[in-house]
């Protein structure tokens, strides 16, 4: 297709930066693209069936692994906070507006389209402190924002239900109860649309009793191998089955007024070498556009394009009165990004992945949050908002690692987009 069948946007390559400069096997030239040995022979015996290429200490024929040393140029890419956003900051001309008194509350935005002009009036009421809070402290919920009468929200984790315990900002442990359903692998193997929808509806119903607003799920990464990280959270090795069942689950959850964060966007394949400590890089994953779109991104695309659900709201009649009204909203208004890098660039700060593909091509509007940024110390909030994502999953002040610059046009421009996305989902 030349155009996206849902949005009508022209489809262009977004992941050329992620192919690693490798030659990929292709049916168009089976012989010419067949993989060959690359690198230099190491001193480590292979356990993966490498061809015999030497002898061991006793003189017997042996197979050694090959190794490559990363170049200084590529190492610098890993160490960079470049979001791949090519916009020149000097071309941004936003007028800096904070703290206006327009008399609006977040409840007034419920039921309005993402692009309704009224959003600008609401966003003008926010203060620099509001920007800092929403961008850097959105882990497991968002804080109350007085300037727009926004209540606090609670978001909870677990791919099979709601895990409602943790440590609050004061370091105190709390427990409010957990509810867990069957594993999603079992759900996917039923091929039962009604059951998948009811699965989501049940979780949405349970959110009322646990005072939960958002759900860090479903998780739609692939069963690439039996040894991939967190396979128990993911549906299938088949992207269509995973995407279809998860989409129905999202529709069920959203029909109850709860918002989801479909995760981990994207190409999240393991839970080792995530970059959980100072001085660590997260793992860099290389692949081509075809593999990404047909396999690893397909479940996310299906969820984002799933059916809309009805939402009730109080409609402002413009004469001081309100009436009950119903509108349709997307089933998916939240995405959680991943620890890993797509190519050399962190997935949660990757402009091509987030703005180029998710927002522009697929038409996604809503809250994009990082994975656990309390431990993901490399997750830079500046890179994140420049890429088109919105909030860090941190609930500890030390997790911010970013200060919103109220006088910087670039910070304001991307920060305003970020808080708009967050508030749209919550409204």
List the predicted regions and their residue ranges.
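Glycoside hydrolase catalytic-domain context in secreted enzymes
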Residues: 1-427
């Amino acid at each position: 297709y030349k155009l996206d069948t849902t949005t009508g946007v022209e489809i262009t390559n977004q992941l050329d930066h992620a192919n690693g400069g490798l030659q990929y096997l292709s049916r168009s030239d089976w012989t010419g693209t067949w993989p060959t040995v690359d690198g230099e022979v190491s001193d480590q015996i292979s356990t993966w069936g490498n061809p015999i290429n030497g002898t061991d200490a006793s003189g017997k024929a042996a197979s050694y692994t090959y190794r490559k040393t990363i170049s200084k140029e590529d190492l610098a890419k890993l160490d960079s906070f470049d979001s791949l956003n090519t916009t020149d900051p000097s071309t941004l001309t936003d007028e800096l507006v904070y703290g206006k008194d327009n008399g609006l509350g977040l409840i007034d935005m419920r039921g309005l389209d993402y692009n309704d002009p009224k959003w600008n009036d609401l966003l003008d009421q926010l203060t620099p402190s509001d920007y800092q809070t929403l961008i850097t402290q959105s882990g497991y919920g968002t804080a109350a924002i007085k300037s727009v009468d926004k209540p606090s929200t609670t978001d909870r984790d677990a791919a099979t239900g709601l895990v409602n315990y943790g440590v609050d900002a004061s370091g105190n442990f709390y427990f409010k109860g957990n509810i867990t359903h069957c594993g999603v692998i079992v759900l996917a193997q039923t091929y039962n649309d009604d059951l998948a929808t009811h699965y989501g509806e049940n979780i949405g119903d349970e959110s009322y009793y646990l005072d939960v607003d958002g759900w860090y799920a479903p998780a739609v990464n692939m069963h690439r191998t039996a040894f991939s990280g967190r396979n128990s959270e993911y549906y299938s090795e088949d992207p269509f089955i995973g995407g279809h069942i998860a989409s129905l689950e999202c529709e069920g959850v959203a029909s109850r007024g709860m918002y989801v964060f479909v995760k981990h966007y994207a190409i999240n394949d393991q839970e080792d070498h995530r970059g959980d400590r100072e001085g660590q890089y997260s793992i860099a994953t290389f692949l081509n556009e075809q593999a990404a779109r047909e396999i690893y991104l397909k479940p996310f695309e299906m969820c984002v394009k799933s059916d809309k659900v009805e939402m009730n709201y109080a409609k402002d009649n413009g004469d001081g009165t309100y009436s009950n009204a119903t509108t349709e909203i997307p089933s998916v208004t939240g995405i959680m990004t991943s620890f890993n890098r797509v190519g050399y660039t962190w997935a949660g700060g990757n402009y091509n992945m987030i703005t180029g593909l998710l927002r522009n091509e697929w038409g996604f509007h809503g809250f994009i949050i990082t994975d656990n940024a309390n431990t993901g110390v490399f997750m830079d909030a500046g890179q994140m908002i420049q890429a088109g994502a919105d909030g860090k999953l941190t609930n500890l002040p030390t997790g911010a690692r970013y200060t919103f610059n109220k006088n910087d046009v670039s910070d304001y421009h991307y920060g305003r987009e970020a808080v708009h996305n967050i508030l749209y989902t919550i409204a």
